[in-house]
């Protein structure tokens, strides 16, 4: 007979409780996580020591995480509620939790009813959880900042990406204990998705085809991985007259908002790079694919042209100062192309119903030059009628490098509300500050 294989040492009860708690938290089962540690605390209330203190802190952590992922704390006005209905700000909740965890760290070696090696583990975990709580506060502040930006004319996402990357670097490997791995994974996923989406927004606004395509794909892959967490979970619903059914767990508002931001960016990407994408498929399939976009900007413009007999609607990219500009689609990084000059510095990256009307382009560029200050306000609609060519031009600028122009080969009033409304709606759809406003649950986004 061979030698018997030694059995692994049994996992201490405390460690098993911790592993169960963090695995629940990692799949956003806040209530289960909270219930488990509260039951454990009730069963061991005579024990005292670090274990009991940590269990109390963990119950508060589960509650804080539920509020954090719901985003209900955004835009709270201080003093706007009565004392009894007042909701503590997320910062207050996490600060209080941080103080609780600090006490566990400070109580290292305090007498308690747990084994010595467990008493060593608890302060170590609490120390790492302190960093996690600090990271949460900084990301919560970041969401507050994004929500506040929804009232701005233009959102500089490059600044947001820089702030987010700084937070990620600061807390990278700060809560790395194996027991905390579900927490670390969900943190990395969330911040990774957000960073990719904001980078994609900045890259689309610079008309960078391949970088924005890759970044959007990375965000999509991470969101898919995250979404499977909810798909795998089933919750049982008992019916009034007996029987029960199971359905997938409803994801938290934060996840749904990130999906919404991705959908908006896909619509913008498919509009800005319509020319490059349409080369990869048939016209009918491209039309069917863009119709699924939300909003369907291509369909919106096509309907407007048919309804009001517009000669052309174009999205113009001002590539002056852009050394990397090489035209539609992907270009090898080492391929050489002379920098555009003259009218070629203002290409129509989107032109409907057909190619840009060359005869109108000098007029369009002249208006863009003469009315630059109005267009740079990023909210005004500029009107110009040229009696020589019997044509009317309406222009607006949704973001710094892009201008929308609507051309009619007839005289149109600058007060025509249909045209002004169309340009304002199209411009707003491209800026889409509403998606930042919709961070707050219940807002019209």
From Swiss-Prot:
It comes from the Eukaryota. The keyword Iron does not apply. One of its GO terms (cellular component) is lysosomal membrane. Keywords: Lysosome, Membrane. One of its GO terms (biological process) is cellular response to amino acid starvation. It is found in: Lysosome membrane. As part of the KICSTOR complex functions in the amino acid-sensing branch of the TORC1 signaling pathway. Recruits, in an amino acid-independent manner, the GATOR1 complex to the lysosomal membranes and allows its interaction with GATOR2 and the RAG GTPases. Functions upstream of the RAG GTPases and is required to negatively regulate mTORC1 signaling in absence of amino acids. In absence of the KICSTOR complex mTORC1 is constitutively localized to the lysosome and activated. The KICSTOR complex is also probably involved in the regulation of mTORC1 by glucose. Part of the KICSTOR complex composed of KPTN, ITFG2, KICS2 and SZT2. SZT2 probably serves as a link between the other three proteins in the KICSTOR complex and may mediate the direct interaction with the GATOR complex via GATOR1. The KICSTOR complex interacts directly with the GATOR1 complex and most probably indirectly with the GATOR2 complex in an amino acid-independent manner. Belongs to the KICS2 family. This is KICSTOR subunit 2. It comes from Mus musculus (Mouse). The lineage of its organism: Eukaryota, Metazoa, Chordata, Craniata, Vertebrata.
């Amino acid at each position: 007979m061979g030698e018997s294989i030694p059995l692994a040492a049994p996992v201490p009860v405390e460690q098993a409780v911790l592993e169960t708690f963090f695995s629940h938290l990692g799949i956003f089962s806040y209530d289960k996580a909270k219930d488990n540690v509260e039951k454990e605390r009730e069963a061991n209330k005579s024990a005292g020591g670090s274990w009991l203190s940590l269990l109390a802190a963990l119950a508060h952590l589960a509650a804080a995480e539920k509020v954090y992922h719901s985003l209900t704390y955004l835009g709270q006005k201080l003093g706007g509620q009565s004392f009894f209905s007042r909701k503590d700000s997320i910062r207050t909740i996490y600060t209080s939790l941080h103080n609780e965890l600090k006490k566990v760290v400070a109580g290292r070696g305090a007498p308690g009813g747990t084994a010595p090696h467990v008493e060593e583990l608890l302060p170590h975990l609490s120390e790492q959880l302190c960093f996690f709580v600090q990271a949460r506060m900084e990301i919560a502040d970041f969401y507050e900042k994004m929500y506040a930006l929804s009232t701005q004319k233009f959102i500089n996402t490059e600044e947001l990406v820089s702030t987010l990357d700084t937070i990620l670097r600061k807390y990278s490997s700060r809560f790395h204990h194996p027991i905390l791995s579900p927490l670390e994974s969900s943190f990395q996923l969330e911040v990774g998705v957000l960073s990719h989406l904001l980078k994609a927004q900045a890259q689309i606004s610079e008309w960078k085809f391949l970088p924005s395509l890759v970044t959007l794909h990375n965000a999509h892959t991470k969101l898919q991985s995250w979404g499977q967490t909810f798909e795998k979970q089933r919750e049982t619903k008992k019916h009034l007259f007996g029987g029960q059914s199971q359905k997938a767990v409803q994801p938290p508002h934060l996840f749904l908002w990130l999906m919404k931001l991705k959908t908006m960016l896909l619509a913008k990407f498919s509009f800005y790079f319509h020319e490059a994408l349409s080369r990869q498929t048939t016209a009918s399939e491209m039309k069917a694919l863009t119709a699924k976009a939300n909003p369907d900007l291509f369909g919106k413009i096509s309907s407007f042209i048919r309804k009001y007999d517009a000669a052309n609607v174009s999205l113009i990219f001002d590539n002056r100062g852009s050394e990397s500009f090489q035209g539609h689609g992907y270009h090898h990084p080492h391929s050489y192309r002379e920098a555009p000059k003259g009218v070629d510095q203002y290409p129509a990256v989107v032109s409907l119903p057909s190619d840009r009307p060359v005869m109108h382009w000098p007029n369009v560029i002249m208006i863009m030059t003469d009315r630059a200050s109005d267009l740079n306000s990023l909210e005004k609609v500029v009107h110009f009628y040229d009696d020589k060519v019997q044509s009317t031009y309406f222009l607006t600028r949704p973001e710094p490098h892009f201008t929308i122009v609507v051309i009619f080969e007839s005289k149109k009033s600058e007060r025509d509300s249909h045209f002004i409304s169309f340009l304002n709606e199209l411009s707003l759809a491209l800026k889409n500050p509403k998606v930042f406003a919709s961070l707050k649950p219940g807002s019209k986004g």
